[in-house]
Each structure stands twice: as C-alpha cells, then as structure tokens.
UniProtKB/Swiss-Prot annotation:
It is found in: Cell inner membrane. This is Light-harvesting protein B-800/850 beta chain. Belongs to the antenna complex beta subunit family. The chain crosses the membrane at residues 24-46.
Amino acid sequence: MADDANKVWPSGLTTAEAEELQKGLVDGTRVFGVIAVLAHILAYAYTPWLH
C-alpha cells in the first residue's frame, strides 16, 4: 500500500475513490437533511402545543 503512488495517505484510497466516497457522504447528508426538515414540519403541523 505504501508503494502505490496512486494511493493517498492516510486513507489508502486513490483520489477517485476518495471523491466517490465523499460524493456518497454528501448525498446521504442531503437526504438526511430533507427527511429532518420534513419531520420538523410535520411535528409542528400535528402537535397542538407548538402553535
């Protein structure tokens, strides 16, 4: 692993692999954010003590 010039320290991933992993992480965070916003809107709409 240390001999491969394409691998980036310390993860051992290539730049392309790291970018792919980061894209998945960002996409997952966006999905989580949308679900969280939707849950907060529904909680506000359906709980009378928040009005």
